């Protein structure tokens, strides 16, 4: 344990005091290279921003067209069996039609009923 602590202290002292002249020479070159790379990155960023400003309205128009297609192609909600409906405005699903439930007077509205017996075709 004492050996490890000794080597650790020696390493810290060497790193702190070792060859400061070599590090001082490299710093200005690194700063100069960073300045050049930052300038190049700034130019590339400006070019990219100009491209995106040009393409943004085109992409927005495409998204609006896709949203309009999806909105128009969406299937409307429909009513299945034994759901009240009106004769003039049918909201019954495919395979159902708006018919009176029975000839009884207490059913004042019509209901969606299956055209065929069993499960309707197409659903």
From Swiss-Prot:
Entry annotated with the keyword Transit peptide: no
Propeptide: 19-77
Organ and tissue specificity: Expressed by the venom gland.
Primary location group: secreted
Keyword Glycoprotein: no
Chain's role: Ion channel inhibitor.
Family: Belongs to the neurotoxin 14 (magi-1) family. 05 (ICK-7) subfamily. ICK-7 sub-subfamily.
Name of the protein this chain belongs to: U9-barytoxin-Tl1a
């Amino acid at each position: 344990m004492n050996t490890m602590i000794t080597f650790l202290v020696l390493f810290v002292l060497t790193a702190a005091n070792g060859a400061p002249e070599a590090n001082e020479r490299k710093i200005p070159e690194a700063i100069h290279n960073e300045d050049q790379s930052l300038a190049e990155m700034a130019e590339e960023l400006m070019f990219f921003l100009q491209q995106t400003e040009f393409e943004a309205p085109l992409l927005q128009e495409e998204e609006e067209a896709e949203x309009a297609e999806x909105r128009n192609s969406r299937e409307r909600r429909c009513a299945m069996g034994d759901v009240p409906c009106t004769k003039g405005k049918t909201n019954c699903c495919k395979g159902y039609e708006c018919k009176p439930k029975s000839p009884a007077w207490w059913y004042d509205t019509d209901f969606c009923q299956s055209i065929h017996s069993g499960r309707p075709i197409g659903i």
